[in-house]
């Protein structure tokens, strides 16, 4: 009589190929990446407008020079280059009834990254300039719809 050895029965559900786990992890990472990217795009679409005070090249200009926003949006001015800049709205180049002093920033933003924010609600064009660099052409316009 011969002895027969039998391997213990294995459960198919307990054995998972490594490749499947790696593939599943890659799918999860891929979906998570798409979700994060979608969230970032959604947030960017609803973000306030930003104007740089000074170009990346070092030029004395507002970037963008002209900006169009919707009524009630906030414009964030960011000192990009570290030169002293301010934001002065020209009382003769803003909608009637808007107080230029109330929306201007006369004090200088001296360091890179310093910001000034203003919420504009009255429709129309808002002309503004940087007082120390106006002669160099540092002027801008915001169109509020």
Swiss-Prot record:
It is found in: Plastid, Chloroplast thylakoid membrane. It is a peripheral membrane protein. One of its GO terms (molecular function) is electron transfer activity. Its main location: plastid. Keywords: Chloroplast, Copper, Electron transport, Membrane, Metal-binding, Plastid, Thylakoid, Transit peptide, Transport. Pfam families: Copper-bind. Residues 48-145 form the Plastocyanin-like domain. InterPro entries: BlueCu_1, BlueCu_1_BS, Copper_blue_Plastocyanin, Cupredoxin, Plastocyanin. The keyword Cell division does not apply. Participates in electron transfer between P700 and the cytochrome b6-f complex in photosystem I. Belongs to the plastocyanin family. This is Plastocyanin, chloroplastic. The gene is PETE.
